[in-house]
Amino acid sequence: MDAAFTAEQDEIRRTLREILGRRCGPDEVKAAVRTAGGYDRELWQQLSRQLGLPGIAVAEDYGGVGCGPADLALACEETGRVLLPSPLLATAALCVPLITALGTGAQRSALLPSLASGGMTAALAVPGPALATALALTGGDAAGQWSGGGRAGGVQARADEAGGGWRLYGEAAQVLDGHSAELLLVAAHAGGFARSRTLLFLVREGAPGLVRSRQAVLDETRPQARVQLRDVPAELLGEQGAGGEGADVLAALAATGRTASAVLAAEAVGAAGEALARTVEYVRRREQFGRAIGSFQAVKHRLADVYVQVQAARSAAYYAAWDPDQGGLALAQALEALRTAAGEAIQLHGGIGFTWEHDAHLYFKRAASDELLFGPVHRLRAHAADRAGLFAPAAAAAAAPARPVSPAAAVAAPPPAHEKVAV
């Protein structure tokens, strides 16, 4: 494995850092989240035209740059540093891979060029707070119960016998950038109890019966929406077989979850590194008892511990960008590093770190919000351990039937003469 970045990757990171340094300062971030869309549309168009940011992982045949998830992860590390509010994650990391994997040739040709150019944004709508489950980040759900599972709730899909196509009814909450996206990918349950399955549908902006509202959230730089579908016409993503079965949506969602977790890990590492850098800069300038507080040994040790944790998380994130199968574990480590770095930033900034005007709380809110959306950390680690089979021998031994024990063997043998017996 060659861990060195290519010249093109270094250039993308350098250019992106320069643009964000000029256009995405703390004041610009706070102004962007207060707009109707929740992000700076002019900056989004600049990043799309100059760097092709939304199309980094889109094939060149569809107007993209033709790079892979690793390049998208490196770009998101830079956007995470400044907590850039943008539809990049929802569009490029969640929706583009699903359209590429499941869409028909006509659907890919119609949608991917617009998404790659930044002219269209997309959002993945999953019923309830089940995004981590749908993406198989915290455990699989072979039955797709999170989408409705034949019970009340979720989003239900029925075939429109009269006009063809499909109709959707239900509600999805915590949809990333769902209030501003021109295209929604809606996960819905179809087939009732007998032929239960989860399918993905395309819903256009302005479709009759579609009601979207922006939610009040903990992290304003990660806008979310509630999407209500009231008999909304929809188009099935992909083709439906003769038996009524669609593509393997759950497998495609799980594959998307693996690459998205690597991207999220890089983004969280970027935020953690910036929170640490700002804290180090502050303790060098802040004086107490006639000297900089950064010269105190206790402060040095705390920041050194954070530095080690952030660097370890960065290494894990880079490895996951190369091997997305390790994305869940890298995401757990990155979220933990961000939470620690943001918490120490607030503590070491002292009283000013608790104020609304300072930026420290934004990084802490990003840490808490991402863990609520994509975690929690202990479940990410548990699922990674299950996938690696770490506890398979123990589970097999526990499931094995007990062997009968003879009465003679049940009596404990006396200890050897040389062995001491504890009383």
Regions found by a protein language model. Give the residues of each.
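Alpha-helical interface subdomain recognition
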Residues: 1-80, 118, 255-423
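Internal helix-loop-helix
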Residues: 48-121, 177-181
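A short, Trp-centered hydrophobic/proline-enriched beta-strand micro-motif
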Residues: 118-134
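Flexible, small-/acidic-enriched active-site or ligand-binding loops
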Residues: 137-145, 174-177, 204-238, 243-244
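Cytochrome P450 C-terminal beta-domain/meander region
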Residues: 149-169
